[in-house]
Amino acid sequence: VGPTGVGKTTTVAKLAAAYSLAAAKGSRPLNVRVITIDNYRIGAKQQIEIYGNIMNIPVSCAETPSDLKALIDMYQDVDIILIDTIGKSPKDYSRIAEMRHFLDAVGQVSDVHLAMSATTKASDMREIMQQYETFGYGSLIITKFDETTCVGNIISALDEKKQSLAY
């Protein structure tokens, strides 16, 4: 989960590739599926589908909470399901609540990560972390490290909120 423009879709694609390729070197390939619930941003579905086609990883689109639940149930035997979520402003409380309702339909989710850009100001990072607490994220994914030379804001925000870094 995370605000708009931080690279959630690209990160999901990178994680899908990493999980499937890393496992291919082992005894058996990991069975990875990607589900997008981003029916809001123009071209979002097509973007993740292109990534999936390139990597030969199935991508599905859930338009409703019940669609998402059905897809999760259908994929219960796969190793990893990655869900590409809608980017929302941390100040858009109604949209965040709507997405929370969407994800609640799934039931127990193993891991929720909050994605944030390394270029985000420390004060904005703290606000984003607070607003997205409703999703029960366990760690952060920091994107766009190549776009900044200062990482103190990230370290400060993680330390203040006692959060760990996943990727």
Residue spans for each PLM region:
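Switch II (G3) loop of P-loop NTPases
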Residues: 1-4, 29-43, 50-68, 72-98
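Walker A/P-loop NTP-binding motif
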Residues: 16-22
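Conserved lysine of the Walker
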Residues: 8
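Short, aromatic/basic amphipathic alpha-helical patches
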Residues: 47-49, 157
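Hydrophobic positions on the alpha1 helix immediately C-terminal to the Walker A/P-loop
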Residues: 11, 15, 47
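Conserved catalytic-core segment of NTP-binding enzymes
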Residues: 33, 64-73, 80, 90-167
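Short, glycine/polar-rich helix-capping loops at beta-to-alpha or helix-loop-helix junctions
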Residues: 43-45, 152
